[in-house]
UniProtKB/Swiss-Prot annotation:
Keywords, alphabetical: ATP-binding, Ligase, Nucleotide-binding, Protein biosynthesis
Protein known as: Glutamyl-tRNA(Gln) amidotransferase subunit A
HAMAP family membership: GatA
PROSITE patterns: AMIDASES
Subunit record text: Heterotrimer of A, B and C subunits.
Transmembrane segment boundaries: none
Gene from which the chain derives: gatA
Enzyme Commission (EC) number: 6.3.5.7
UniProt xrefs under InterPro entries: Amidase, Amidase_CS, Amidase_dom, AS_sf, GatA
One Gene Ontology molecular-function label: glutaminyl-tRNA synthase (glutamine-hydrolyzing) activity
Length: 492
C-alpha cells in the first residue's frame, strides 16, 4: 500500500472517495508520522483522540455520500488559531495553558467541511520572527538538510511548524498566517506552496492578533492544487471581523491548470538587489522563461517605493503589536506573576511572559507611537504605505496580471546563524514579501528550484486584489516546470 503520508491532499481526497482507504487509516498514518518526527518539533500539541473521532465521523459521512469538500483530510493548525477546548498559546509563555471557549472562524469552516484536527503547530512567538526560533517551545527544525551536512536549519517563520509539517508529511496541509511574509518565506524554505490571500479574504476572528492591518490567514500545502482546495474552505465573509470582505468565494481549484496565454507578467527592476545571490537571480530568470513558454508576456515594471517598504513595515507592525499585546496583563487569563500591587503584577507578568523578540517589538511600537515621535515615524510610515499601494495600482492599471519576484533572498539558514547581535539581519529576510502585506495584495510562493547545496528555493507571484485565481494558474505553470520537492527522510 502507498505511504498515505506521501499523498497530496487532492490524491487523498480522491482515495477516500474511491474507498481505497478510510479516513481513520489516513489519520492513523499521519499520527504515526508525527510521533516518529518529534525531533522536528513541528507540533506543540498533538490531539490523537480528537483526530480519530473526527476521522470516524468523516468515514460515516463519506459512507452516506454526505462528506464535505475536506471530509477525512487530516490538517495541522498553527498555534495562533483558537481551537475550542484545546490549548492555544501563540507559542508564548504569557498565554500559559490558555484553552479558548470559542473556535476561530477559519478552523470552524475547515471542520464544517469535514477536515480532521491532528494538533497545533509551532510558530514564532506571537508570529514575530522569520525563523521559528522565538517560540517558547523551542525552534522547529527544517526537514531539509544541506547536501552532505547534518547541520540543523530553520524552516522559516513565523509559520515554521506549518511549513515543516507539510514538507515532512506530518499533515496533508496546514493553516498559517502572514503579516510580513510568514506564509511565503517558510514555504520557500521547505519546498512547499504557501498563499497569503488578499487582506479581508479570510476572517481574522479567533486568530491571535499581531498587526491587525497586515495579518491574513492562508494555507501551506504540498502543491498549488492543494493550496487552492484549502483556501476555498478557509475564505469567506465573516460579520465578526469588520475587515472581512463580503464577496463570493470562487472555486479556486478550477483555476489550477487554467491558460496563462496572453497574461502580462511584471518583472520589477527594484527587486534586483545589490549583492543578490546569483542562484536567486538565475531562478528568477528561469521562472520568467517558464511563464513565457506557457504563453505569458514579460514586461519590466517599476515599483519605486520598494526600498522604503521594510523600514515602514518595521514601524507599522510593531506599533500595532504594542497596542494588541497590551491585553496580556495576567488579570483574566494566561500566566500571572504576582507583585506587591497591580502595576508590579503587570510588569512582572509581562517581563516573565514575553520573549526577547516580542519585548523588542513592543518597545519599538510604543516608541514610534509616543507623543514626540508619532508624526516623524508612524504617520510617515503610513504615508509610505500609501505610496507602495499606489505603485502596485499603477502597475496593474497598465494591464499587468501578476508580478513575479523571488520569494526570499536566500535558502534556509542554520539555527542560531542570524539575528543574534543584529536583529536587522533577521528582518532582511522579509525584503521581498512585506510590500504585499503593506498593499493588502495576494501573494503565492511556489518552489521553483534548488541552491548549490540542494536546498529548495521559491518564487513569488503577486496578484491584483481578490485575483487569487490568476496566481493559482500561474503558480501551477511554475510547479509543472520545476517539479515537486520532497526532503530525504533522516528523522525516523
Amino acid at each position: 500500500m502507498t505511504d498515505l503520508t506521501s499523498l497530496t491532499l487532492a490524491e487523498a481526497r480522491d482515495g477516500l472517495a474511491n474507498k481505497s482507504f478510510t479516513a481513520v487509516e489516513l489519520t492513523d498514518a499521519h499520527l504515526a508520522a508525527i510521533e516518529a518526527a518529534r525531533v522536528l518539533n513541528a507540533y506543540v500539541l498533538e490531539t490523537p483522540d480528537q483526530a480519530r473521532q473526527m476521522a470516524k465521523a468523516a468515514d460515516a459521512q463519506i459512507a452516506k455520500g454526505e462528506g464535505g469538500p475536506l471530509a477525512g483530510l487530516p490538517l495541522g493548525i498553527k498555534d495562533l488559531f483558537a481551537t475550542k477546548g484545546e490549548r492555544t498559546t501563540a507559542c508564548s509563555k504569557i498565554l500559559g495553558d490558555f484553552k479558548p471557549t470559542y473556535e476561530s472562524t477559519v478552523t470552524t469552516q475547515l471542520w464544517r467541511d469535514g477536515a480532521v484536527l491532528l494538533g497545533k503547530l509551532n510558530n514564532d512567538e506571537f508570529a514575530m520572527g522569520s525563523s521559528n526560533e522565538t517560540s517558547c517551545f523551542g525552534p522547529v527544525i527544517n526537514p531539509w538538510r544541506r547536501a552532505g551536512s547534518d547541520a540543523k536549519l530553520v524552516p522559516g517563520g513565523s509559520s515554521g511548524g506549518s511549513a515543516a509539517a507539510v514538507a515532512a508529511g506530518l499533515c496533508l496541509g496546514a493553516t498559517a498566517t502572514d503579516t510580513g511574509g510568514s506564509i511565503r518565506q517558510p514555504a520557500a524554505f521547505t519546498g512547499t506552496v504557501g498563499i497569503k490571500p488578499t487582506y479581508g479574504r479570510c476572517s481574522r476572528w479567533g486568530i491571535v492578533a499581531f498587526a491587525s492591518s497586515l495579518d491574513q490567514a492562508g494555507p501551506i500545502a504540498r502543491t498549488v492544487r492543494d493550496s487552492a482546495i484549502l483556501l476555498r474552505s478557509m475564505a469567506g465573509h465573516d460579520p465578526k471581523d469588520t475587515t472581512s470582505v463580503d464577496r463570493p468565494v470562487p472555486n479556486y481549484e478550477a483555476a489550477v491548470g487554467g491558460s496563462v496565454k496572453g497574461m502580462k507578467i511584471g518583472i520589477p527592476k527594484e527587486y534586483r538587489l545589490d549583492g543578490m545571490p546569483a542562484e536567486i537571480e538565475k531562478l528568477w530568470s528561469q521562472g520568467a522563461e517558464w511563464l513565457k513558454a506557457a504563453g505569458a508576456e514579460l514586461v519590466e515594471v517599476s515599483l519605486p517605493h520598494t526600498k522604503y517598504a521594510l523600514p515602514a513595515y518595521y514601524i507599522v507592525a510593531p506599533a500595532e503589536a504594542s497596542s494588541n499585546l497590551a491585553r496580556y496583563d495576567g488579570v483574566r487569563y494566561g500566566a500571572r506573576v504576582n507583585g506587591r500591587n497591580i502595576i508590579e503584577m503587570y510588569e512582572n507578568t509581562r517581563a516573565a511572559g514575553f520573549g526577547a523578540e516580542v519585548k523588542r517589538r513592543i518597545m519599538i511600537g510604543t516608541y514610534v507611537l509616543s507623543a514626540g515621535y508619532y508624526d516623524a515615524y508612524y504617520l510617515r510610515a503610513q504615508k509610505v504605505r500609501t505610496l507602495i499601494k499606489r505603485d502596485f495600482e499603477q502597475c496593474f492599471d497598465q494591464g499587468v496580471s501578476a508580478i513575479l519576484t523571488p520569494a526570499t533572498p536566500s535558502a534556509a539558514f542554520g539555527i542560531g546563524e542570524k539575528g543574534g547581535a543584529d536583529p536587522v539581519e533577521m528582518y532582511l529576510n522579509d525584503i521581498f514579501t512585506v510590500t504585499v502585506n503593506m498593499a493588502g495584495l495576494p501573494g503565492i510562493a511556489v518552489p521553483a528550484g534548488s541552491d548549490s547545496q540542494g536546498l529548495p528555493l521559491g518564487l513569488q507571484l503577486i496578484g491584483r486584489p481578490f485575483d487569487e485565481d490568476t496566481l493559482f494558474s500561474l503558480g501551477e505553470v511554475i510547479e509543472q516546470a520545476a517539479g515537486r520537492f520532497t526532503p530525504a527522510k533522516w528523522w525516523a
